[in-house]
């Protein structure tokens, strides 16, 4: 049986934590930030953990894990 391929978009956008949770970067930080206040920009910095339901789908698209 051939190897399963990982979705390239998943490789680029998600990381797996040691406990098995899936992290992703917060959306809406590329351009047009002048219209947002400093609190919005600060709070959307970094990454967040996605929900369990979404994580299940992401893990299916990455059959050998995300490194």
From Swiss-Prot:
Q: Which cysteines are joined by disulfide bonds?
A: none
UniProt signal peptide: none
Q: Which family is it part of? A: Belongs to the bacterial ribosomal protein bL35 family.
- Name of the protein described by the UniProt record: Large ribosomal subunit protein bL35
Alphabetized PANTHER family for the sequence = 54S RIBOSOMAL PROTEIN BL35M, LARGE RIBOSOMAL SUBUNIT PROTEIN BL35M
Q: Which UniProt keywords apply?
A: Ribonucleoprotein, Ribosomal protein
Q: Does the keyword Ribonucleoprotein apply?
A: yes
For the keyword Ribonucleoprotein, the answer is: yes
Provenance organism = Novosphingobium aromaticivorans (strain ATCC 700278 / DSM 12444 / CCUG 56034 / CIP 105152 / NBRC 16084 / F199)
Instruction: Report the record's Gene Ontology biological process terms.
Output: translation
Q: Name one GO cellular component term.
A: cytosolic large ribosomal subunit
Q: Which GO terms describe its molecular function?
A: structural constituent of ribosome
Q: Which InterPro entries match?
A: Ribosomal_bL35, Ribosomal_bL35-like, Ribosomal_bL35_CS, Ribosomal_bL35_sf
């Amino acid at each position: 049986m051939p190897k399963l391929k990982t979705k390239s978009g998943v490789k680029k956008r998600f990381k797996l934590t040691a406990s098995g949770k899936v992290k992703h970067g917060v959306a809406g930080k590329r351009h047009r930030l002048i219209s947002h206040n400093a609190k919005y920009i600060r709070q959307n910095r970094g990454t967040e953990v996605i929900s369990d339901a979404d994580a299940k789908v992401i893990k299916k698209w990455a059959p050998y894990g995300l490194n």
